[in-house]
Amino acid sequence: MSAATGHGTAVPGTAQAPLPGMPEPLWAGSPSKLLAFLDCPRRYRMQYLDRPAPERRRQRAHTSLGIAVHNALREVWDLPEPTPAAGGRLVDDAWVDVGFRDPEQSRRWRARMRDAVTSYLRAGGLERRPVGIERTVAFVSDDLRVQGRIDRLDDRDGELVVVDYKTSRQVPTDDDARTSLPLALYAAAVWKMFRRPALRVELHHVPSGAVAAHEHTPQSLARKVEQARSIMRDARRADADHAERGAASTMFPAVTGPLCAWCDLRAHCPEGQSAGPEKPDWAALEDD
């Protein structure tokens, strides 16, 4: 609570710097928060700092699809007898008709994802019960605290493996797994919490059944953690400037490009709007 306002945010110009000799307070956030600042400081500001928060656009069809698949792959483990067919039926239970072009498009994609989840589970998704399902993990590195939720954590003969489900049309590659900052940070957090090495990370593309994987080393994980700390230092400086100057801060430029067409906050960003027309809610599923 802010001493200046009695509420959760301070009046611009009243932020207090740490006392001399005192360590910097922890900067806490998720991998998504770090990537938001890296990708577009303007979106980061609107999403995490501006209060009241700008209204976001309604959910897109591919998000509705992804949520249904993730929910089904989580809830299948709560069934008395988890089976591939039962997991597929859970897609129907979790489905929401939000963002689709019309009921027919929603129906087609629901059937596709029901079949995809069934096939994924039949191909080995039920081989062993995970150590964690949508498990929250966290670690602290100096003045950085990272916390996030992993889709699945496996113990494969003593090896801890971080698994992330993907449902987009693009099939991930091993290089995607290698370069993923979130996966590496989740692995570092698992290692810290379980006190056992967690070096393997995997992207499971549910629609195709493809698995992209990378085996980190302790050194490569350390480099990813340092990358996160570098982003955090820049974000911390921007946060402090926002606390002092509010909307007058110049440390949150809009990074314009193709992603502006998909941004949930583009209605509040003139630069993003000028980058090109907005994509329809169902555009990610359009070529079906």
Predicted features, each with a name:
Residues 61, 65, 69, 109, ...:
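Hydrophobic (often cysteine-bearing) scaffold residues that line and stabilize catalytic clefts
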Residues 189-288:
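Metal-dependent nuclease catalytic regions and adjoining charged, substrate-binding loops involved
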Residues 58-63, 103-110, 253:
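Conserved phosphate/pyrophosphate-binding and hydrolysis machinery centered on Walker-type P-loop NTPases
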Residues 68-134, 140:
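A non-catalytic, helix-rich entry segment at domain boundaries
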Residues 41-48, 159-164, 236-237:
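Active-site-adjacent bridging/hinge elements
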Residues 135-230:
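Mg2+/Mn2+-dependent nuclease catalytic core
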Residues 1-62, 281-288:
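C-terminal, charged and often intrinsically disordered regions of DNA end-processing helicases
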Residues 30, 129-135, 146-150, 256:
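Short beta-strand or tight-loop elements
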